[in-house]
């Protein structure tokens, strides 16, 4: 079903058409007072109810963060929109797009001859040897500070690229897999780029 939660999601789950008004009534029935919510689990259940929490948020979030929702801060929930319309996009910006020639070409055009780029370089080994007005560091944050506050617990991602000889592999550009799968989502890029 479509995600983030929207009218299409509710219609498919409950097997009946949902309007904005009907969705508002549903959420008024299942919502709780968010004032005392301190964890992701608390705020998610208070916002969408226990059923939608179990269906969409709990397992996906725990898989993504590698921690129980009871241990995650409530602020994390705010990154996931809940829509009272049929918009199935994750972002709702008025203008969204992908560079016509791709991101690599865009970055090449942005580069300037006055820029000095160091790749595969340990910042700690060169920091006293370089001078700069502005520095863009793209390594681990804790490494930048030479681990003075210890190591941050990082999660890694593994991307598996596959090519399928079919006009359409799945219904939407991005489909999340919240339950017992070894992966969190599948993206069909041609649906993003047209």
Regions found by a protein language model. Name each.
Residues 7-134, 138-145:
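Active-site/ligand-binding neighborhood in enzyme catalytic cores
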Residues 1:
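N-terminal FAD cofactor-binding segment of flavoenzymes
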Residues 121-194:
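Mid-domain catalytic core of redox enzymes
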Residues 4:
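Short aromatic/basic micro-patch
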